[in-house]
């Protein structure tokens, strides 16, 4: 029976990490809902406020690498606690900022602290959940998507009640602090609770220091070998760049596409608001997709094939999105959200599989930077293509990107038994390709 159910400790890890995922995506999605109001209040151009957002998003991606290192060194729960408190306090600072520069600095801090979650939270799950890890990743994905889904409504409700965009950040920051206290006080065996003294002394996480390799770690290298790099992991990281382009591009330009191609939105008195609501509704299907993506990984024998299946379906969907309008466009977009968002839990599952236990944090940090940091170039590319050729052509371009992602995903499967062995012999670093 223990094979089929998570232990109490595992469920504690899953819900704590997933709760952090919820608040992280909630904080990072609030901006799009209140951007117009902020720009008007501070007499800022959309270009200026867009640059502030770009800095925040870049730090959101870039911070994942050092966050991954810190999670490996000090323990996932400690670093995750810092992230939750940091992003919550930063949200309060955003709500209390008056003027362009205070807002820019506080939003940059928000992006930086939000970057901590993915490497630390996913490492927390990868190390703390031994069975049915796919289900755990699925729950984590669902809560993150739920945060994205509810953030615009939270912002709208706060503005309606308190007549200020600041209330959205202040209320979210206060809620985040409450969750941070819960995270800090909840005991997890094998994980250190947050302590300035422990971190100052450079203590390693007890569980990571005491543990050997898990059942999915690559075999240890013998002799003079100093490291192993699975070929599949290289292709997984490359796939993250391509999928990050798809994620940021589709999420950013759906409202513009709907304003242009959906008649009832085009003719509405408030097309921006209506396009935002429709985008939010379509993201709801991503909740189902994220759950299914985690669920299916515990059921299939070859999880490496699942991302390829996702992109095989998504590629023609992008082409159809670029060609259709009105009800057909809405229906196809819903299917896209349902299918595409099942990719992320599987990707996380595979990154955990192909990285050693002691380096889970760094592995997720690199993956997160590639996904959200480099993938964010989609906003610039999408803006150029939309200005020059129309937003529908940008979705045609993403069909091509998706086709390339499909080939990369297939490469993961066909190289899963190959690895590069690095060794140092008499001071000289050498490498060779080896089949397991």
Language-model regions: role of each:
Residues 143-192:
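Helix-loop-helix hairpin linking two adjacent transmembrane segments in secondary transporters
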Residues 31-32, 231-287:
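Extracytoplasmic gate region of multi-pass secondary transporters
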Residues 62-99:
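Conserved MFS/SLC helix-loop-helix module at the cytosolic interface between two early adjacent transmembrane helices
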Residues 43, 75, 96-101, 130, ...:
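Helix-breaking motifs and short loop linkers at transmembrane-helix boundaries and internal kinks
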Residues 106-144:
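Cytoplasmic helix-loop-helix junction between adjacent transmembrane helices
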Residues 29, 57-65, 148-149, 283-291, ...:
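Residue-level signature of mid-helix packing/kink "hotspots" within the transmembrane helices
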Residues 300-347:
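C-terminal transmembrane helical hairpin of 12-TM major facilitator-type secondary transporters
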């Amino acid at each position: 029976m223990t094979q089929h159910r998570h232990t109490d400790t595992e469920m504690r890890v899953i819900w704590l990490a997933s709760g952090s995922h919820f608040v992280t995506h909630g904080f990072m999605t609030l901006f799009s809902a209140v951007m117009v109001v902020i720009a008007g209040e501070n007499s800022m151009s959309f270009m200026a406020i867009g640059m502030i957002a770009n800095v925040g998003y870049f730090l959101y991606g870039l911070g994942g690498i050092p966050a991954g290192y810190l999670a490996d060194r000090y323990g996932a729960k400690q670093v995750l606690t810092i992230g939750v408190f940091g992003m919550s306090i930063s949200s309060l600072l955003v709500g209390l900022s008056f003027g362009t520069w205070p807002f820019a600095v506080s939003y940059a801090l928000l992006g930086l602290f939000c970057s901590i979650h993915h490497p630390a939270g996913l490492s927390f799950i990868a190390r703390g959940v031994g069975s049915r890890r796919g289900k755990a990743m699925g729950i984590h994905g669902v809560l993150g998507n739920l945060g994205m889904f509810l953030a615009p409504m939270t912002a709208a409700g706060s503005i309606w009640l308190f007549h200020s965009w600041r209330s959205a950040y202040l209320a979210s920051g206060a809620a985040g602090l409450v969750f941070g206290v819960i995270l800090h006080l909840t005991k997890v065996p094998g994980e250190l609770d947050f302590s300035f003294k422990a971190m100052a002394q450079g203590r390693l996480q007890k569980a990571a220091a005491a543990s050997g390799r898990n059942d999915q770690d690559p075999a240890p290298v013998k002799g003079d070998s100093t490291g192993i790099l699975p070929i599949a992991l290289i292709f997984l990281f490359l796939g993250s760049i391509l999928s990050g382009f798809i994620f940021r591009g589709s999420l950013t330009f759906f409202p513009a596409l709907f304003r242009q191609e959906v008649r009832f939105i085009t003719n509405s008195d408030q097309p921006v608001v209506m396009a935002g609501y429709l985008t939010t509704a379509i993201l709801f299907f991503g909740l189902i997709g994220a759950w299914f993506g985690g669920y299916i990984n515990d059921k299939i024998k070859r999880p490496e094939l699942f991302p390829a299946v996702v992109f095989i379906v998504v590629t023609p969907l992008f082409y159809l999105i670029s060609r259709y309008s009105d009800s057909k466009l809405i229906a196809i977009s819903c299917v896209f959200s349902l299918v595409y968002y099942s990719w992320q839990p599987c990707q996380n599952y595979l990154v955990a599989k192909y990285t050693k236990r002691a380096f889970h944090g760094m592995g997720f940090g690199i993956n997160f930077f590639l996904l959200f940091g480099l993938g964010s170039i989609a906003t610039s590319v999408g803006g150029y293509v939309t200005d020059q050729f129309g937003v529908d052509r940008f979705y045609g371009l993403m069909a091509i990107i998706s086709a390339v992602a499909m080939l990369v995903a297939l490469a993961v499967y066909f190289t899963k038994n190959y690895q590069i062995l690095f060794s140092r012999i008499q001071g000289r670093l050498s490498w060779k390709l080896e089949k397991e």
